[in-house]
C-alpha cells in the first residue's frame, strides 16, 4: 500500500465513519479498486478506526468531560443515566461480536454485491426516517438506547451505514436530533476500541500478519482519517439538526445501484 492509497482510504474512512453512507462499504470498494489484500486491510483498518475514535474524542470532548464529571459524583444523575444508556446500547453489538464474528467476517469476504444491496437498504432507511415525523422526545430512554443498539449491531453488514442506521432509528423513535447525533457517535467508541484490541491481539498471536505496509503509509492513513473524521463529525451533527439526511439517501441509492450493476 502506497502512502497515496493510504491517504485516500484514510479520507474515505474518516468521512464515511460519520456520514450515513457506510464506512465499511466504501473501504471495501476502495480496497477492491486498489487491489489491497486482506492482511493489509486488517492492519490498516485498525489504524484508521483508532484515528476516527480520536476525532470523536476531540470534537465531543465537552460532552465527554460532562459525562465523566457527573459520573464521578457517584450518584444517579443525568450523566450516570447517559453512561447506562451507552452500556445498554453495546449489548447487541457485543453479542454479535462474541457469537457471530466468524459469520460476519465471511460476509465481508463475499464480494461487493452485498455492499450494493446494503447501500440500497441504507437509502431506504434514511428516506423513511426523513418522511416519518413522530412526536419528539427530550431524552433518549433505556428502551430507545437498546433499540438503537440493535440497529448498530445490524450495521456490521458491509454497506449498511452504522451512523445512518443508528440515527435513522433514533429519529423514527422520536429522539431529539442534536442529542441523538452525539449519542450515536459516543456509543460507537467502546465497540470500535474493543474490536481494534481483539484484532491487534489476533495479529500478535500470529493468526494474521501485518502486510508489507510501510510505516509512512500507516501514519498518513491515520492522519487523513483523523482530520477527515473531525470535519465529518462536526458536519454530521449539523446535518442531523437540520434534517437533511435525504441527500445521503439519494447518494446511497445511486452508489448501491452502481455497485450492483458492476457486479452483474
Swiss-Prot record:
An annotated Gene Ontology molecular function: undecaprenyl-diphosphatase activity
Kinase recorded as keyword: no
Known role: Catalyzes the dephosphorylation of undecaprenyl diphosphate (UPP). Confers resistance to bacitracin.
Keywords per UniProt: Antibiotic resistance, Cell inner membrane, Cell membrane, Cell shape, Cell wall biogenesis/degradation, Hydrolase, Membrane, Peptidoglycan synthesis, Transmembrane, Transmembrane helix
Classification via InterPro entries: UppP (IPR003824)
Residue intervals passing through the bilayer: 41-61, 82-102, 106-126, 140-160, 213-233, 244-264
Native source species: Bacteroides thetaiotaomicron (strain ATCC 29148 / DSM 2079 / JCM 5827 / CCUG 10774 / NCTC 10582 / VPI-5482 / E50)
Subcellular location: Cell inner membrane
Bilayer topology: Multi-pass membrane protein
Protein name per the record: Undecaprenyl-diphosphatase
Pfam families listed in its UniProt record: BacA
A GO cellular component annotation in the UniProt record: plasma membrane
Further remark: Bacitracin is thought to be involved in the inhibition of peptidoglycan synthesis by sequestering undecaprenyl diphosphate, thereby reducing the pool of lipid carrier available.
Gene Ontology process terms (BP): cell wall organization; peptidoglycan biosynthetic process; peptidoglycan metabolic process; regulation of cell shape; response to antibiotic
UniProt record similarity statement: Belongs to the UppP family.
Reaction(s) the record says it catalyses: di-trans,octa-cis-undecaprenyl diphosphate + H2O = di-trans,octa-cis-undecaprenyl phosphate + phosphate + H(+)
EC number: 3.6.1.27
Amino acid at each position: 500500500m502506497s502512502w497515496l492509497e493510504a491517504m485516500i482510504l484514510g479520507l474515505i474512512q474518516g468521512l464515511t465513519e460519520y456520514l450515513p453512507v457506510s464506512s465499511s462499504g466504501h473501504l471495501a470498494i476502495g480496497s477492491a479498486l486498489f487491489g489491497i489484500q486482506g492482511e493489509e486491510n486488517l492492519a490498516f483498518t485498525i489504524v484508521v478506526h483508532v484515528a476516527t475514535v480520536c476525532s470523536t474524542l476531540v470534537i465531543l470532548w465537552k460532552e465527554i468531560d460532562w459525562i465523566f464529571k457527573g459520573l464521578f459524583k457517584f450518584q444517579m444523575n443525568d450523566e450516570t443515566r447517559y453512561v447506562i444508556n451507552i452500556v445498554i446500547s453495546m449489548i447487541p453489538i457485543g453479542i454479535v461480536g462474541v457469537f457471530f464474528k466468524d459469520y460476519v467476517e465471511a460476509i465481508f469476504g463475499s464480494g461487493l454485491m452485498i455492499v450494493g444491496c446494503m447501500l440500497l437498504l441504507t437509502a431506504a432507511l434514511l428516506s423513511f426516517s426523513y418522511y416519518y415525523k413522530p412526536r419528539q422526545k427530550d431524552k433518549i430512554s433505556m428502551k430507545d438506547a437498546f433499540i438503537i443498539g440493535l440497529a448498530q449491531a445490524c450495521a456490521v453488514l458491509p454497506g449498511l451505514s452504522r451512523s445512518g442506521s443508528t440515527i435513522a432509528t433514533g429519529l423514527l423513535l422520536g429522539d431529539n436530533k442534536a442529542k441523538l447525533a452525539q449519542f450515536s457517535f459516543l456509543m460507537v467508541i467502546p465497540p470500535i476500541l474493543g474490536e481494534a484490541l481483539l484484532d491487534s491481539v489476533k495479529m500478535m498471536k500470529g493468526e494474521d500478519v501485518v502486510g508489507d505496509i510501510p510505516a509512512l503509509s500507516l501514519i498518513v492513513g491515520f492522519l487523513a482519517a483523523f482530520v477527515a473524521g473531525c470535519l465529518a463529525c462536526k458536519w454530521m451533527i449539523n446535518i442531523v439538526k437540520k434534517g437533511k439526511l435525504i441527500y445521503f439517501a439519494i447518494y446511497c441509492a445511486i452508489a448501491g445501484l452502481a455497485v450492483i450493476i458492476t457486479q452483474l
